[in-house]
Amino acid sequence: MPEAYIVEAVRTAGGKRGGRLAGVHPVDLAATALDAIVERSGVDPATIDDVIMGCVSQGGEQAMQVGRNAVLASRLLPQSTPAVTIDRQCGSSQQAIQFAAQAVMSGTQDVVIAAGVESMSRVPMGSTAMFHMKEGLGHYKSPGLEEKYPGVQWSQFMGAEMIVRKHGFAKDDLDRFALASHQKARAATESRAFAAEIVPVAIETPEGPQMHTLDEGIRMDATLDGIASVKLLSPEGSITAATSSQICDGSSAVLVMSERALRASGLAPLARIHNLTVTAGDPVIMLEEPLFATDRALQRAGMTIDQIDLFEVNEAFAPVPLAWLKHTGADPDRLNVNGGAIALGHPLGASGTKLMATLVHALKARGGRYGLQTMCEGGGVANVTIVEAL
């Protein structure tokens, strides 16, 4: 079977809710990542077969095929470039990578951009469902769903609390994990570890035009006492805003190519895609599926967890990567080495390609060979992607 290669991977620096990227339309934010990956890779825009854009809240400014709109807003992509927008919840753009790789491995396409965008400031999380319910246009929970899951609330927060109880984590475990995320993100920023992946975004500020290049959510002065003092989201629970991923604006992109296209273009890949896995499980606890998806990915790849040099496990809530570590026995020093979504933000549909950008560049910088990325996703789904650095 033909191989699929990652040639380049980029992301914008994250913007806080109502922060430095809040003034940028998500279509233009996505176009920025598309243009950057064309410029940095040197790929001929005319050779791009498709753009697959992940986006969760596909309403308002992210409605009407945001992926295609981003292509049309791009400075560098011709209007003849096709695009599609997909929603696999938080794993949307990781699934975009997998669809891109599958297209290349099937031989039906040679050059595909997987990308993602989410402006959580301008299109708030859950707003698409809330709008329709407010207007009397119905609820996504059908009679059939209610029959199978009577009275169940589909809640990430409840799922996170269920993981805390199931795995016996103390609140202090969550707080310490969150502190480490900020500390690693601060160290990565100060050492310019993100320089190879971050693309500048032109913004307007009260001081005039600027370029946004630094992740806005990192608490450079984070302390355990400060994190521990944040109010609980539920009086009976353990999760706080400080141990949850940050609402974030951002976009990201990954260029996937076939070996045939690499030879024709003379471009050099960063990594080879080694395994593509997606599984689904309990939709109520919801966020635990990365544990079992990782088991399946390693089994199918014929690998053990110790063979993986770096892991990117999305920090939707602190108990998710903590449960993943406990289940897999992975070395915690290899996990989210530059921090995660607790510090850097979780721009929903953009997080999959964002994490891949961090993973492939970290593998290159650290001389690692294999990297594994996984994310929990709404509905109890999880993607796993294993890559080999080249």
Language-model segments: which ranges?
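Conserved active-site "lid/cap" helical segment
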Residues: M1-S74, T85, M162-K171, S181, ...
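Condensing-enzyme catalytic core mediating Claisen C-C bond formation in acyl metabolism
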Residues: M1-V27, A36, R165, A222-E288, ...
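N-terminal extracellular/periplasmic Venus flytrap/periplasmic-binding protein-like
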Residues: V10-T12, G23-V27, A31-T32, R40, ...
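Conserved catalytic cysteine-centered active-site region
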Residues: C55-D110, P150-S155, D221-Q246, H327-K354, ...
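Active-site-proximal alpha-helical scaffold in enzymes
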Residues: I86-E118, V164-A193, V254-R260, P347-G368, ...
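Flexible glycine-/small-residue-enriched beta->alpha junction loops
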Residues: V111-I163
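Active-site pocket-lining segment
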Residues: M158-E161, E197, T205, H274-A343
